[in-house]
Amino acid sequence: MTPLYQLTVAQAREMLARGEISSLELTDALLTRIAAVEPKVRAFLVVDAAGARAQARAADARRAAGDASPLLGIPMGIKDVISTQGLRTTCASKMLENYTPVYDATAVARLKAAGAVILGKLNCDEFAMGSSTENSAFQQTRNPWNLERVPGGSSGGSAAAVAAGEAPAALGTDTGGSIRQPAALCGITGLKPTYGRVSRYGLVAFASSLDQIGPMARTVRDCAIVLRVIAGADPFDATCTDYPAPDYEAALTGDIRGLRIGVPREYFVAGMQPDVEAAVRTAIEVLREQGAEVCEISLPHTPYALPVYYLIAPAEASANLARFDGVRYGLRVPGESYFDELERTRGAGFGPEVRRRIMLGTYALSAGYYDAYYKRAQQVRTLIRRDYQQAFEQVDVIAAPTTPTVAFKIGAHTDDPLAMYLEDVCTLPLNLAGLPGLVVPCGFAEGLPIGLQLIGRAFDEESLLRVGDAYQRVTDWHTRMPEVREDGSA
């Protein structure tokens, strides 16, 4: 029998529905798994064992009473930038080390209403700023495939937990690739929905025009199940659209014959690891063999996406993080005056990467530089969005690499912020355009996973899920799980 911690969401749902296992048994199995591997992987910042068991018992009682909610009794983890009532939400920052929200984010509330069991909060880069989870103020999450490598970021804890069998699914957030990049590096499936598909209410904001909550799991089907629960209009988020959430599972037909898939030449960047490019191109050929029509396309403004992103995102972050001043909540360091106290508090509360982005954003918004930097970046953002609009007049889905390399060693880019920023070169253009992106495992190099990225039209997650599911029906990359060893190897 498959160990319970290896079950996918869909498998667990079926076994729970048939009465073969209880939610409490499943939750206990995962808590046991967490206890066994967490000292090595370090994906969780908070494990709420007592709360999870109580929720599992409640789920079993609901099922006995005839409830058949879509996630009833399914344990999940939550990235620690998403508010959870009564459960510490730190954003992996000293600034919010002891902050406990008094309300749930809309996405979390919807998970709970659907019967999900919340196992705890998952590590991330501080305030979701980073690509390796090395910027967490509390601990370094490690890639379960090789404990000397990063899991990616900023949703590194979410990706590592799913890959290591500590949770069948988790919520992550994606501002410039923070669901897709760690999903690729940890060998799991991750979906960044269209901007506005999922409510951001209760998400601690990094860059408000870019942030999006999405599911991370082992299979496309699991992501479809979770997305249907968390998607939809929310009166608490004016940027959340009122488009009805379709039945995403119904889109998983396995048939992609005649679907037009474009391959953008600009995504195969200079310096890309040859094995990564080969794996992605092989995966695209698999889609061709399944009946898809594949052609090369151009997204000419893609090379400008990186500098545009690193003007717009820090500018929004500098405004959003101004609220953390030590006056109303969070860390407070006494000073001789209000301004001295503010300087001491923010200096002690924010890590170096957060401070760097605040300074960069403040500069971009300052008088005399606004037109030259921020305004011009927004103009180029429009051109990037237009590139995608024109491409989708020719194709239905775009297929591309997710990362230029496999997971790098912990500490490899610590002293080189630009090298770290380049890790997101294939993912952040989607955020600027507000489009959905799906990552599925498509191979290995150096014993480390590689991810294929699928990009769709706005609010057409169904096509992405259909293509990703079709790919997973004829490949087994997504079924492979790492064996976490003491020596840091896989």
UniProtKB/Swiss-Prot annotation:
It catalyses: L-glutamyl-tRNA(Gln) + L-glutamine + ATP + H2O = L-glutaminyl-tRNA(Gln) + L-glutamate + ADP + phosphate + H(+). The active site is at K79, S154, S178. One of its GO terms (molecular function) is ATP binding. One of its GO terms (cellular component) is glutamyl-tRNA(Gln) amidotransferase complex. InterPro entries: Amidase, Amidase_CS, Amidase_dom, AS_sf, GatA. GO terms for biological process: translation. This is Glutamyl-tRNA(Gln) amidotransferase subunit A. Keywords: ATP-binding, Ligase, Nucleotide-binding, Protein biosynthesis. It is an enzyme of class 6 (ligase). Allows the formation of correctly charged Gln-tRNA(Gln) through the transamidation of misacylated Glu-tRNA(Gln) in organisms which lack glutaminyl-tRNA synthetase. The reaction takes place in the presence of glutamine and ATP through an activated gamma-phospho-Glu-tRNA(Gln). Its EC number is 6.3.5.7. Belongs to the amidase family. GatA subfamily. PANTHER family: GLUTAMYL-TRNA(GLN) AMIDOTRANSFERASE SUBUNIT A (PTHR11895:SF151), TRANSAMIDASE (PTHR11895). Heterotrimer of A, B and C subunits. It comes from Roseiflexus castenholzii (strain DSM 13941 / HLO8). The lineage of its organism: Bacteria, Bacillati, Chloroflexota, Chloroflexia, Chloroflexales. Pfam families: Amidase.
